Amino acid sequence: MSVPKAKALLTVCAALLLCGCGQALSEREIVRAVFFARQQGAYSACLLLADQNAESDGVQYKTVSARGDTAAQALHLAEDALPGRLYYGLLDLAALPPGCDWADAQTLGTLLYDKAQPAPELSVFVLDTADHSWAADAASLYEDMKAVEREYDLHCGLQQLFTQADGCAVPGYRTDSGYDFYLLAKDAPARRVSGLPAQLAAVLCGQADNFFSAYHDGQALCKSEVNVTVEDTAVQLHLRDCTLQSLADADDDLQGFLCAELQHAFAALTHDAKADFFHLQFWHENLYGVGREAPAPTLAVVFE
């Protein structure tokens, strides 16, 4: 077979794979987001789909949802309610149910991975506890979560649910501003942090690289690029282009208050941690060998 013919055949095969073995993408149900909730012992699953028949200035999404005894059953019933064949290749957001723990995250993550692998653009949130109507709220929830990702340069990929054997960390959606952060350890209750501690946790987990948060009891605002360096368990937090703004009349020591709050948050996040969320034990064992107990973590805040 000549080289041009081989290239043409490969192109045709790739096109068939992308469109679903000959079925045009425009004829399929394109899934953009999957939401899970848990109510009264049962699961609810909602698929947010691209509405390819919508007018350009109208609503661009449609939804289908179902309830089941398990998350897999609820998702399967929602899929069965659609007349067309589903396409998960453009799925870029999944919301885990509020109150989920590590085991739930593993189960739902595996279910999503089976549907959308390798899904490099798929991001994960934990849904808030509000009582949402899927038909009325799913599209706005999707847009809000994607906006939070852009504004805070935040991303938790699906693969990050599986990078550690004893825990994972996931940002949490909130309706006002910013985001929460969930530390989900194996065989332990979920832990949620908010505000500046949530953003510090996201930075330490490698899921964000900036701060944009109120602190000092809401009297000051910090906006900064952040980089983390680690030597053994000594963490350095490098703040670049840092802007500290007073939201009150008093001219306080804004830098001092920020450092104090970061130190307090770091101590709380690393005290009696049920999993190595910030990889400090991992780096210590790489330096000194497996099984060596790591010293207490320390934090230094550096303004650059």
Predicted segments — roles?
Residues 2-9, 18-304:
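Membrane-proximal alpha-helical signals and transmembrane carboxylates
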Residues 14-15:
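Residue-level signal for mature regions of secreted extracellular proteins and peptides
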